[in-house]
Design a protein with these regions (language model features):
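Extracytoplasmic/periplasmic, Sec-exported soluble proteins
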Residues: 49, 53, 66, 82, ...
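Short, solvent-exposed loop/turn segments at secondary-structure junctions
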Residues: 37-40, 76, 106, 124-127, ...
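Active-site beta-strand/loop signature of hydrolases that rely on acidic residues for catalysis
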Residues: 31-37, 56-83, 121, 146, ...
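Acidic/histidine-rich helix-loop elements
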Residues: 34-53, 75-79, 166-200
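Metal-dependent phosphoester-hydrolase catalytic domains
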Residues: 1-12, 131, 202-223, 228-303
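Beta-strand-turn-beta hairpins that frame and shape the catalytic cleft
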Residues: 23-33, 123-128, 139-183, 276-277, ...
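A short, flexible N-terminal coil/short beta segment enriched in small residues
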Residues: 1-22, 167-170
């Protein structure tokens, strides 16, 4: 029991002395950004002011100048006179010429169809990509991956978003589209928070089993980015993280929660990697008026 407690403490709290994040990156390292961007909140051009949430998100992405970016809750429209395309900005303006967008829901019934899912953007060529479906008929999320050619070193990057718990976004008066949660609307509308936690924990456990199975099969050194919707003390995190390096544990300080609501200590977003790779610095700034998640920026040594 004592050992179990220590395990949770060291997974939850970073014990490294605070260090200033070095903007200059060494040549044998890649800079990675992982972020649940919350659909960019609003892509309507009439709301795209200099301090709009979407603009704050894109400005931070630009400032980081990462080599590889993994996004959860990513969405994009086709560019038109009313709506901005997030993909177009990342490719044409920021020059991320290689990307793989795993579309989980195309939202084809909307007046202007919006594609939603997870995405990987890279300055390095993508030589292979694919995805594995979680077994939920009405909520078709995936574990996606892209194999990158990083200076002749093949590295596989995985990215995923585990099932949202709907703890506060879906109340009875919400005007959201419920079509994608048909299999568990009873829990969403009528379940108390504790019931939701129990239900979605069981969902996450099944998703974690598929993730760990695929990570164990990886033929290459890999990086795993995710919004786990589970904290480090959970079975889900402990199962996935087993035998892997955690960028936060290697370089993080304090609690460093990644979710801005409910509790400042909730570290539900992670960057993990196989033992051939190591994080050399970690940064998760509190970006205001942006996503409800905080970004993770880390430098990873490629041997």
């Amino acid at each position: 029991m004592i050992l179990f407690g220590y395990k949770n403490i060291f997974s939850t709290i970073g014990f490294h002395y605070p260090k200033h994040f070095q903007q200059e990156k060494e040549s044998n390292k890649i800079r990675l950004l992982s972020w649940n961007v919350d659909d960019f909140l609003n892509s309507e051009k009439r709301f795209d002011s200099s301090n709009s949430p979407r603009r704050n998100i894109l400005n931070f992405i630009k400032s980081v100048n990462a080599d590889v970016m993994c996004f959860q809750d990513f969405s994009s429209y086709e560019e038109n006179r009313l709506l901005a395309s997030n993909i177009k900005y990342l490719v044409d303006t920021l020059k991320y010429n290689y990307y793989y967008f795993s579309v989980d829901d195309p939202y084809e019934k909307e007046l202007y169809p919006r594609k939603y899912g997870t995405a990987i953007f890279s300055k390095y060529p993508i030589v292979d990509s694919g995805r594995f479906a979680y077994n939920w008929k009405h909520f078709p999320e995936h574990l996606m991956y892209a194999t990158l050619n990083i200076n002749h070193h093949p590295i596989r990057v995985y990215n995923t978003h585990l099932r949202s718990m709907m703890l506060h976004k879906f109340g009875r008066d919400s005007t959201e589209d419920y079509s994608f949660v048909q299999d568990d609307t009873t829990i969403i509308f009528h379940g108390h928070r504790y019931q939701k936690l129990l239900y979605y924990d069981s969902v996450h456990i099944q998703q974690a089993k598929l993730i760990k199975e695929q990570l164990n099969k990886s033929p290459l050194p890999f990086i795993f980015c995710a919004d786990l919707n589970s904290v480090p003390s959970s079975y889900v995190y402990q199962r996935i993280r087993k035998d892997l390096n955690d960028a936060f544990i290697q370089n993080g300080t304090g609690w460093s929660g990644t979710y801005s609501e409910l509790s400042p200590t909730l570290r539900i977003d992670v960057v993990l990697m196989s033992n051939e790779l190591n994080s050399t610095q970690y940064y998760s700034p509190r970006i205001q008026n942006a996503s409800d998640h905080y970004p993770i920026v880390t430098d990873i040594a490629i041997h």
